[in-house]
Amino acid sequence: MSEVESQQSQETNGSSKFDVPEIELIIKASTIDGRRKGACLFCQEYFMDLYLLAELKTISLKVTTVDMQKPPPDFRTNFEATHPPILIDNGLAILENEKIERHIMKNIPGGYNLFVQDKEVATLIENLYVKLKLMLVKKDEAKNNALLSHLRKINDHLSARNTRFLTGDTMCCFDCELMPRLQHIRVAGKYFVDFEIPTHLTALWRYMYHMYQLDAFTQSCPADQDIINHYKLQQSLKMKKHEELETPTFTTYIPIDISE
């Protein structure tokens, strides 16, 4: 197991890391090199949630990657067949996604504020990932259009609310859920079916621009190569030779002019 570089220890402004709870998040490692961050959506979502809390100095966060193709003996001993994400709080391991969310919301300082209640937004972003997977598998215009229609609805919502993020000018759990999925759509969609988010969806691009400015996203984001390989494995496609030697790239450019 390896620790990622974005470990957050709160020791500034006279506050010792021992004054706040120490939280460990175990995430899936890259399926290319087995060490860096992998392309698990839930892993990135909870990484972002916890990173935001670490920035607020309510917790000290340690993030550890595990190569699930060759899990180390101590991981197999402690967690058997369980796959990350796994959250460890004061020795207590939380193993299921819904339980992790509930634990962050109810038991981790500041977590309650991340989990805002907004039925409209919850409905708006659900099933987006399903549409991506259907597009990648079916590779037809109908599936492309279904995904495009969904993105248009998100764009219209952002335009109507005229806020920086989904529910306001402060990030919440919905943003930590949506943005990793948008990144997968952007990277995998382009690679496999030449799908691109249209430039006329200006509110959506502005939203992505704001997300790209945040350490919570950039520190948790997997490399383009890992996102692509994630779907190659699902489709039983082969890796390129010496793919582990490639320098990781991260697509974050914005193709339109963003006026603040």
UniProtKB/Swiss-Prot annotation:
List where this protein forms a coiled coil: none
Its Gene Ontology molecular function terms? calcium ion binding; chloride channel activity; glutathione peroxidase activity; lipid binding
Q: Which residues cross the membrane?
A: 42-66
Q: Which UniProt keywords apply?
A: Membrane, Mitochondrion, Transmembrane, Transmembrane helix
Where in or outside the cell? Mitochondrion; Membrane
Name the major location.
mitochondrion
Family named by the database record: Belongs to the chloride channel CLIC family.
Domains: what does the record tell us?
Members of this family may change from a globular, soluble state to a state where the N-terminal domain is inserted into the membrane and functions as a chloride channel. A conformation change of the N-terminal domain is thought to expose hydrophobic surfaces that trigger membrane insertion.
Mind telling me what this protein is named?
A: Chloride intracellular channel Clic
